[in-house]
């Protein structure tokens, strides 16, 4: 029997079938991936964040960025005695600001706050942290937030002293008393509906445990 010789057309036909098979596999794979995407969508990491959390953290990161700006610190330093320590700054601020609950005319820029001469816990804490940073001390802003809506409940500061962060509440005129908020009637418990965050150097850190009973 004479063997059948393979012609060019036969080889082309086989190659065509191979390419068709490859393309078919790719199309089927693409269809399966598309179906998988819609049935099992890739989880966006940000979806783990509760609604309002990013806006809350972004806001106070922005406040700290302005506080830490070279221009802000230079303007504030010009109003301070370079020999002031944190205790002096605490007393200096009390002489400059009056606690007023009226919500009109609030500022979050330290120099504007000082010009207005008034504020609540937010303004007192911003000015205090700004003054500390202006004189080269380590200080950060601390915010207690209602996690049901991510609005602030109270704001204070922490100073870095002897290797640890020390509680400072400029508007309440107290130092190193982190347990005091446990008895405050916020209508919500610290650690469950109330979370506490510290803001510094473009970052934030949850510090709820420092101020809770647990």
Protein language model features and the residues they cover:
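Membrane-interface motif at the C-terminal end of an N-terminal transmembrane signal
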Residues: 31-46
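Aromatic- and glycine-rich peptidoglycan recognition patches
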Residues: 181-214
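Secondary-structure boundary elements
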Residues: 45-119, 151-152, 163, 201-214
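Intrinsically disordered, low-complexity segments enriched in Ser/Pro/Gly/Ala and basic residues
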Residues: 6-8, 23, 46, 191
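N-terminal targeting leaders characterized by basic, low-complexity, disordered sequences
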Residues: 1-12
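Hydrophobic/aromatic-rich core segments of domains that either
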Residues: 68, 123-189
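Solvent-exposed, well-ordered amphipathic alpha-helical segments
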Residues: 13, 29-31, 84-85, 132-137, ...
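N-terminal Sec-pathway targeting helices
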Residues: 10-28
């Amino acid at each position: 029997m004479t063997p059948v010789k393979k012609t060019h057309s036969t080889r082309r036909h086989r190659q065509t079938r191979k390419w068709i098979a490859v393309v078919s596999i790719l199309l089927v794979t693409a269809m399966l991936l598309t179906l998988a995407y819609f049935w099992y969508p890739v989880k966006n990491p940000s979806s783990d964040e509760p609604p309002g959390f990013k806006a809350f953290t972004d806001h106070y990161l922005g406040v700290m960025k302005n506080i830490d700006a070279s221009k802000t610190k230079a303007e504030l330093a010009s109003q301070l005695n370079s020999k002031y320590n944190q205790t002096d700054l605490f007393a200096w601020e009390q002489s400059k600001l009056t606690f007023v609950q009226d919500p009109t005319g609030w500022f979050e820029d330290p120099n504007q706050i000082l010009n207005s001469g008034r504020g609540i816990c937010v303004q007192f804490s911003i000015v205090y942290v700004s003054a500390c940073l202006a004189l080269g001390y380590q200080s950060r802003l601390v915010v207690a937030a209602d996690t049901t809506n991510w609005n602030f409940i109270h704001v204070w500061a922490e100073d870095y002293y002897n290797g640890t962060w020390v509680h400072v509440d400029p508007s309440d005129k107290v130092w190193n008393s982190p347990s005091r908020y446990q008895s405050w009637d916020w209508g919500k418990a610290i650690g469950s509906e109330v979370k506490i965050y510290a803001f510094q150097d473009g970052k934030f850190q949850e510090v709820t445990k420092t101020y809770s009973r647990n």
